[in-house]
């Protein structure tokens, strides 16, 4: 059994890195500890230029770099020194003049950064596929019993600290080996993703000839948290986040206080935050079971997020109990005080949490308080996944947005300026409501939300019931539908409720009947030409 605590001293290290962040200081520290450095190409030159003693691999092997650098480290004196088992292969190594290499610091050619360039063609991509690097990484990781592998510059300081304490323990070497295999796995996945999108029937194999979806889909996620249970107590669960961080999200958020996030907390917080990101002016979104139950937008000079919270809560105070609250502005102390005094809340998330707000929420120790950072106004493209038994559905993220100039007025009466503001607001909310989705809104406040019904007209009825239960007036409100109305009954019911304007995608075989129903009731209706199903 391997001794977990015995420290491995380092006498010889091979350093060959593409990302040279921190490598000069790392090598200097190694030399100060009496470590002999082997190096290649650009790394060797960088170390030499900084006065660090190193042996070029070509001099060590007696074999020059060749084929424009394609063959540098693929040599028995290198791989024998890395793979050699110190307790079994010592005699063979000595017979062939192979010296043990105790530490390998390698990271790989920037393949991903190369292939995202618009001018990158297939030959350029191929030349940026690293061969020697992954081979050394895998060799060192396989022989982690005797060799330390470092693929991340962020580990340099910890490695030096351990060496100063006498060497690296087996537990440290095992962890570094795991990181190495994760690194090469992600690297090979990038290559497979890229090559899998190439149209082999075309003569010019550049980025313009690439398809959207590769033959195999490779994406790496890192475990951020093991959870007490999943969606239900009998299910086990963990939260994994993308290895490469993107825009501000629930995955990048920092938890400032409160109980550990549950599986459902993460899912609901994601729904709330992604919805509130849709609005440029101060907004509040309250979510329950992944559905917005209250949303409001209030300009800064009219009360900002403090007023927006009041209005969002007023939409459905009953459902807001135990909900998730998201803001698109810094959470201030006054708004935080209003929340904790008024309701039980599971999670509050905002781009920034003020010191005053933190102090207020601290009195409620179980409330999970998350700070996610700012996000760009323009949403980044990406992928959405839905697991099915035996498969995975992959689609581009629904980042489609509409502006007033995108709307097609299809009724005799055009919507007023205020109705247009409310229609676009309601449309943004409907995008995040489970289909079939109906949203009633007035003055950029939801007054009723109907979610998840098999019949669109029943979702409209539920929205009306919600408004009545909250004591909010539907008359004079607008209505948004995430998909087209298949029959005129949805508009007829809206007219009876007092709806004055409707926004929907259009595209039904019976659009003319639906438009006629709106005209009969003097309802203004606009088509977006864009559907927002959410399942």
Swiss-Prot record:
Gene3D superfamilies tied to this protein: 3.40.140.20, Methylglyoxal synthase-like domain
Domain MGS-like: 6-151
Catalytic activity line of the entry: (6R)-10-formyltetrahydrofolate + 5-amino-1-(5-phospho-beta-D-ribosyl)imidazole-4-carboxamide = 5-formamido-1-(5-phospho-D-ribosyl)imidazole-4-carboxamide + (6S)-5,6,7,8-tetrahydrofolate; IMP + H2O = 5-formamido-1-(5-phospho-D-ribosyl)imidazole-4-carboxamide
Alphabetical list of CDD domains matching this protein: IMPCH
Molecular function as annotated in GO: IMP cyclohydrolase activity; phosphoribosylaminoimidazolecarboxamide formyltransferase activity
Keyword Acetylation found: no
Pfam families named in the record: AICARFT_IMPCHas, MGS
Keyword Transcription regulation: no
Pathway assigned in UniProt: Purine metabolism; IMP biosynthesis via de novo pathway; 5-formamido-1-(5-phospho-D-ribosyl)imidazole-4-carboxamide from 5-amino-1-(5-phospho-D-ribosyl)imidazole-4-carboxamide (10-formyl THF route): step 1/1; Purine metabolism; IMP biosynthesis via de novo pathway; IMP from 5-formamido-1-(5-phospho-D-ribosyl)imidazole-4-carboxamide: step 1/1
Protein family: Belongs to the PurH family.
Name of the protein: Bifunctional purine biosynthesis protein PurH
């Amino acid at each position: 059994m391997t001794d977990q605590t015995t420290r491995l001293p380092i006498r010889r290290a091979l350093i060959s890195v593409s990302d040279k962040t921190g490598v000069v200081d790392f090598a200097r520290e190694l030399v100060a500890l009496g470590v002999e450095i082997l190096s290649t190409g650009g790394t060797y030159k960088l170390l030499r230029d900084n006065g660090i003693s190193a042996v070029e691999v070509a001099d060590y092997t007696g074999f020059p770099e060749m084929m424009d650098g394609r063959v540098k480290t693929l040599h028995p004196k290198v791989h024998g020194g890395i793979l050699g088992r110190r307790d079994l292969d010592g005699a063979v190594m000595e017979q062939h003049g192979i010296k043990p290499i105790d530490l390998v610091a390698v990271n790989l050619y920037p393949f991903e950064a190369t292939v995202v360039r618009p001018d990158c063609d297939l030959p350029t991509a191929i030349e940026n596929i690293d061969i020697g690097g992954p081979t050394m990484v895998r060799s060192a990781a396989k022989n982690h019993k005797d060799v330390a592998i470092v693929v991340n510059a962020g580990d340099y300081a910890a490695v030096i600290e351990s060496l100063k304490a006498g060497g690296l323990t087996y537990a440290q070497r095992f962890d570094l080996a795991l990181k190495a295999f994760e690194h090469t796995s992600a690297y090979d996945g990038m290559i497979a993703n890229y090559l899998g999108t190439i149209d082999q029937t075309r003569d010019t194999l550049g980025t313009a000839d690439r398809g959207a979806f590769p033959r195999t889909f490779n994406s790496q996620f890192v475990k951020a948290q093991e959870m007490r249970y999943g969606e239900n107590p009998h299910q086990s669960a963990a939260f994994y986040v993308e290895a490469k961080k993107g825009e501000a999200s629930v995955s990048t958020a920092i938890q400032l206080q409160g109980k550990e996030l549950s599986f459902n907390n993460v899912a609901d917080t994601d729904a709330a935050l992604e919805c509130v990101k849709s609005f440029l002016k101060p907004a509040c979104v309250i979510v329950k079971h992944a559905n917005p139950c209250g949303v409001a937008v209030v300009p800064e000079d009219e009360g900002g997020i403090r007023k927006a919270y009041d209005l969002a809560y007023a939409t459905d105070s009953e459902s807001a109990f135990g909900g998730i609250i998201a803001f698109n502005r810094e959470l201030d102390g006054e708004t935080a005080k209003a929340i904790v005094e008024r309701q039980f809340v599971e999670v509050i998330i905002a781009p920034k949490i003020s010191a005053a707000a933190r102090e207020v929420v601290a009195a409620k120790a179980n409330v999970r308080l998350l700070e996610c950072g700012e996000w760009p106004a323009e949403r980044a493209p990406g992928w959405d996944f839905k697991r099915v038994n035996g498969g995975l559905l992959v689609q581009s993220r629904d980042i489609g947005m509409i502006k007033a100039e995108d709307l097609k007025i299809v009724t005799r009466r055009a919507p007023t300026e205020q109705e247009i503001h409310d229609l676009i607001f309601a449309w943004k909310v409907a995008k995040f409501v489970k289909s079939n989705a109906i949203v009633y809104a007035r003055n950029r406040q939801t007054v009723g939300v109907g979610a998840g019904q098999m019949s669109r007209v029943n979702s409209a009825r539920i929205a009306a019931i919600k408004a009545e239960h909250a004591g909010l007036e539907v008359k004079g409100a607008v209505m948004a539908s995430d998909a087209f109305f298949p029959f005129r009954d949805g508009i007829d019911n809206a007219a009876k409720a007092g709806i004055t304007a409707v926004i929907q995608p259009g595209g039904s075989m019976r659009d003319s009947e639906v438009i006629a129903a709106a005209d009969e009731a003097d309802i203004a209706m606009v088509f977006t030409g864009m559907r927002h199903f959410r399942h």
